[in-house]
């Protein structure tokens, strides 16, 4: 009995055209085809690289300054990537010097802004490099449309989600938005997450935050993410809360177009 040189075609392999998830991989005997195995190894390597890639804030700072947006680069209490990965608690707080810098910035620019925006590398600086500038443009446009005041953008090296609480508190902001690189998956090394907190302050838990996840070309488009964010911000200001008490009940918009913004259809969504 001879072993087929090529794997038999799976009847549902066509679903791979609709999702980047690792489905319908096929088989050769009792094993994966060589191509699928190599693709897995590549995806795993890309995820590892995304975690360890150093955050390069210079292009983002240049883009912000070109737009006339004030910004400041700070460091969390984690001194380097190794400590950041070993001590998650240090990534949630600013270094003492950074906190002092932010107090000085607040003294110059004043406080009580409606929205503060933090950009942190998180577990994927690649996601920040690829998507943060575009999302900041969307947030600026949304704030201008709604009449919300914006604090200077705060960039944080070795930051985790909760660092937004300290930043927002020091800036005396009504809300804080954290744009952060999400933990890479095997098909998503560049996924950007967005976290919203009303009346940020040190010590809040994840229950106080709303999350908009998987912002990238193959996931949630910039326009769709901004649509959801606009709804959540308006409701947060109206109801004076965020987190588990605030549900995303935004109506699904008509196609929010833009060549780079339209995410591919998936079989999970209705036509």
From Swiss-Prot:
The entry's keywords: Bacterial microcompartment, Cobalamin, Cobalt, Lyase
Recorded family membership: Belongs to the EutC family.
Binding site for adenosylcob(III)alamin: 161, 182, 211
Record GO biological process: amino acid metabolic process; ethanolamine catabolic process
Compartment annotation: Bacterial microcompartment
Assembly: The basic unit is a heterodimer which dimerizes to form tetramers. The heterotetramers trimerize; 6 large subunits form a core ring with 6 small subunits projecting outwards.
Family matches, as HAMAP family: EutC
GO cellular component: ethanolamine ammonia-lyase complex; ethanolamine degradation polyhedral organelle
Cofactor annotation comment: Binds between the large and small subunits.
Gene3D superfamilies: Ethanolamine ammonia-lyase light chain (EutC) (3.40.50.11240), Ethanolamine ammonia-lyase light chain (EutC), N-terminal domain (1.10.30.40)
Key word Lyase present: yes
Reaction it catalyzes: ethanolamine = acetaldehyde + NH4(+)
EC number, UniProt record: 4.3.1.7
Keyword Lyase: yes
Cofactors required: adenosylcob(III)alamin
Pathway noted in the entry: Amine and polyamine degradation; ethanolamine degradation
Primary location group: other
Alphabetized PANTHER family for the sequence: ETHANOLAMINE AMMONIA-LYASE LIGHT CHAIN (PTHR39330), ETHANOLAMINE AMMONIA-LYASE SMALL SUBUNIT (PTHR39330:SF1)
Function comment: Catalyzes the deamination of various vicinal amino-alcohols to oxo compounds. Allows this organism to utilize ethanolamine as the sole source of nitrogen and carbon in the presence of external vitamin B12.
MF-aspect GO terms: cobalamin binding; ethanolamine ammonia-lyase activity
Pfam family membership, one: EutC
Designated name of the protein: Ethanolamine ammonia-lyase small subunit
């Amino acid at each position: 009995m001879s072993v087929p040189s090529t794997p038999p075609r799976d009847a549902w392999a066509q679903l791979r055209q609709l999702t980047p998830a690792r489905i319908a991989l096929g088989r050769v005997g009792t094993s994966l085809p060589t191509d699928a195995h190599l693709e897995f190894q590549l995806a795993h390597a890309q995820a590892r690289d995304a975690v360890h890639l150093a955050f390069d804030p210079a292009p983002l700072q240049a883009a912000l300054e070109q737009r006339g947006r004030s910004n400041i680069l700070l460091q969390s209490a984690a001194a380097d990537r190794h400590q950041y990965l070993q001590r998650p608690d240090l990534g949630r707080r600013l270094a003492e010097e950074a906190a002092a810098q932010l107090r000085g910035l607040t003294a110059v620019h004043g406080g009580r802004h409606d929205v503060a925006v933090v950009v942190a590398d998180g577990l994927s600086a690649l996601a920040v490099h690829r998507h943060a500038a575009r999302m900041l443009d969307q947030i600026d446009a949304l704030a201008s449309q709604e009449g919300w005041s914006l604090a200077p953008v705060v960039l944080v090296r070795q930051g985790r989600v909760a660092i937004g609480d300290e930043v927002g508190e020091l800036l005396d902001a009504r809300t804080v938005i954290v744009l952060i690189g999400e933990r890479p998956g095997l098909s998503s090394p560049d996924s950007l997450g967005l976290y919203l907190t009303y009346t940020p302050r040190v010590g809040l838990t994840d229950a106080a935050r709303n999350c908009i996840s998987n912002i990238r070309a193959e996931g949630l488009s910039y326009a769709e993410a901004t649509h959801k964010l606009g709804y959540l911000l308006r409701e947060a200001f109206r109801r004076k809360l965020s987190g588990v008490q605030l549900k995303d009940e935004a109506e699904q918009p008509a196609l929010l177009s833009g060549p780079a913004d339209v995410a591919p259809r998936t079989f999970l969504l209705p036509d």
